[in-house]
Amino acid sequence: MSNIYDTANQIERELRELDEFKALQAAYEEVKADEAAYTLFKEFQGFQQGLQEKQMRGEEFTDEDAEKAQSIATKVQETAVINELMQKEQAFSLVVNDLNRIIMTPVRDMYND
């Protein structure tokens, strides 16, 4: 029997070869090539991370957080290359979600006996 971590590493290598990953990678390169879009994307990522950290600490979101989220979301929606990146990320996430569903089958089966 092979080592499960060897299998996981093989899956990681195969994910990099998927069309969905290659499309995501190409879309990210397009964002990076557009300085304004890349700056906005990094701001968006940082803001999202900050909100997640706030949520994990049990802090409430402020009106200022909501206003900034709306402002950044509007700018992101108006930026075609970022929208394309998000679409490609969503397509790749579907593959990852399918893999997670498959991997978690033993646990689901156990609880559904």
Swiss-Prot record:
InterPro entries, alphabetized: Com_YlbF (IPR010368), YheA/YmcA-like_dom_sf (IPR023378)
Q: Name one Pfam family in it.
A: Com_YlbF
Signal sequence interval, chain numbering: none
Q: Which family does it belong to?
A: Belongs to the UPF0342 family.
Protein name per its UniProtKB record: UPF0342 protein EF_0681
**Native organism taxonomy:** Bacteria, Bacillati, Bacillota, Bacilli, Lactobacillales
